[in-house]
């Protein structure tokens, strides 16, 4: 929590200077046993991002429900930096303290994606038998952001089926030593 507090003290004013509005962003996610909870992040987009998304749909680089574009104009300059370095994810330590999440586990998805993926990906719902995590086996293996959901699920299932304290330490140390830099973040 100390790291989160320091990051908020440093990054917070920069976020607010570039884009008025709340410092934090929350979104509904699906957790253990399908329970819905609010995940917290430092806001990386302009306040009107959802409205602007409608104008940009023709430039969507993803199929289906997901929306991604390389130089998304909805993301602030500070937002690009905090996404690349995963600083935007630090408020999720609050989710860990609340009991919604664990440090390590499969990343939680939004409810609309869960509905889609449970129909398309065999064994997808198994990931909801454990608490979601801030980092996980998929993330330390490079499957973050704009990577295949199927590859992330394969990693999540591997983690669940092979869980051990040793594997958790391996993931934790890999996260720390590889750094929090997300090459797949836009």
What do these predicted ranges mean?
Residues 13, 22, 32-35, 80, ...:
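Gly/Ser/Thr-rich helix-start
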Residues 13, 26, 74-77, 92, ...:
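Residue-level recognition of specific faces of alpha-helices
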Residues 1, 9, 65-130, 171-175, ...:
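A short, structured surface patch at a secondary-structure boundary
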Residues 25-73, 135-154:
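Short, glycine-rich, amphipathic interfacial segments at transmembrane boundaries or analogous
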